[in-house]
Curated annotation (Swiss-Prot):
Pfam family, one: PRA-PH
Annotated EC: 3.6.1.31
Matches recorded under Gene3D superfamilies: MazG-like
InterPro entries: HisE, PRib-ATP_PPHydrolase-like
Top EC group: hydrolase
Reactions accelerated catalytically: 1-(5-phospho-beta-D-ribosyl)-ATP + H2O = 1-(5-phospho-beta-D-ribosyl)-5'-AMP + diphosphate + H(+)
GO terms assigned for molecular function: ATP binding; phosphoribosyl-ATP diphosphatase activity
Pathway(s) this gene product operates in, as recorded in its UniProt entry: Amino-acid biosynthesis; L-histidine biosynthesis; L-histidine from 5-phospho-alpha-D-ribose 1-diphosphate: step 2/9
Family recorded in the similarity comment: Belongs to the PRA-PH family.
Keywords: Amino-acid biosynthesis, ATP-binding, Cytoplasm, Histidine biosynthesis, Hydrolase, Nucleotide-binding
Domain of life: Bacteria
Designated name of the protein: Phosphoribosyl-ATP pyrophosphatase
Amino acid sequence: MTQSTQTTPSNAASTTDTLLRLAAIIDSRKGGDPEVSYVSRLFHKGDDAVLKKIGEEATEVVLAAKDARHGGAPKALVGEVADLWFHCLVMLSHFDLSPADVLAELERREGMSGIEEKALRKSRDREQNGD
């Protein structure tokens, strides 16, 4: 059995710092040379290339999770999730968003049950659509 590293209040700041540092590096690749930077190449190719990578990486996470459940290496799952998170950071940057935006939304939802949050979201969507 592998040991999981849980985020606790004492190490949450360093986890957030890691995301923010990585996001800053990704942001710095905007306008960079697509011949020398993978991230610059994705930005240069546009929305479809960035979004396609999200789909590919999400599929790889699902497959790695299924493998891990059936005796595969948990480290492979962690690696695939890291790839997905990285490409999500690229996507956020591409759309001029940041990890702070996502963290703020998660904080807003914290302490609220998933059922309650979903009901509030549906109600808000109905109000916005004039239903």
